[in-house]
Amino acid sequence: MKQYLELCNRIIDEGTWIENERTGKRCLTVINADLTYNVGNNEFPLITTRKSFWKSAIAEMLGYIRGYDNAADFRALGAKTWDANANENQVWLNNPHRKGVDDMGRVYGVQGRAWSKPDGGTVDQLKKIVDNLKAGVDDRGEILSFYNPGEFHMGCLRPCMHTHNFSLLGDTLYLNSFQRSCDVPLGLNFNQVQVYTLLALIAQITGKKPGMAYHKIVNAHIYEDQLALMRDVQLKREPFEPASLSINPDIKSLEDLETWVTMDDFEVSGYQHHEAIKYPFSV
């Protein structure tokens, strides 16, 4: 919680007002934030100064792992996070590449599991990473990238958290995750959970020990219609002791994650939190 609260206060104290063209709103913005999560010690970065819907965050990451491109598939897992971008973004609604209701296009996990090649084939980045790590191989390029500028026009949203770089030292697995943009009041609690859980899951299915996860954010911001709630409500609350995350040990392969895993395979214990805060969402 400490590094989360420090970033929120830094944005309020040092941020610059920037006009966001996509949303038509101003954002109080800082550049560069580095957060770390000790996954090996099970220091789960779950926000306690408001209720955090951690199951939705993990469900969304599971959808990325499966390469989903439809908001209905995310809803079936327990995440409604893509409903608005798939169905309420006017630019996407007018896009000829949109296939219909709930279609997200070639975003996030689609790129991670089926990156298009010039010869007409696809690259499954995640499978290559998992296969290498299971064999004890780190080629210094165990990189999962969702950022494909050549296909931005074929999706409803550019990826915010766009790259995950895995590194193996002995039998300990590390993760560096890179995020170009972060809606701190709404998105950061999700993103923290996702970075942590991604390392925990990939370590588990490759037979490695999880180490540290390093989370780099470039543009961290608070929208103008979120500022009062963050400054006058959430930051006035005292944080509780951190919770811990347990993952079903029967999850042993990428195929398991692709087929039968549900939110019932994840459990958070000791989660004390303040009341939920409904921050405005900007499509």
Curated annotation (Swiss-Prot):
CDD domains: TS_Pyrimidine_HMase. Coiled coil: none annotated. This is Thymidylate synthase. Its EC number is 2.1.1.45. Homodimer. One of its GO terms (cellular component) is cytosol. (6R)-5,10-methylene-5,6,7,8-tetrahydrofolate binds at residues 183, 282. GO terms for biological process: dTMP biosynthetic process; dTTP biosynthetic process; methylation.
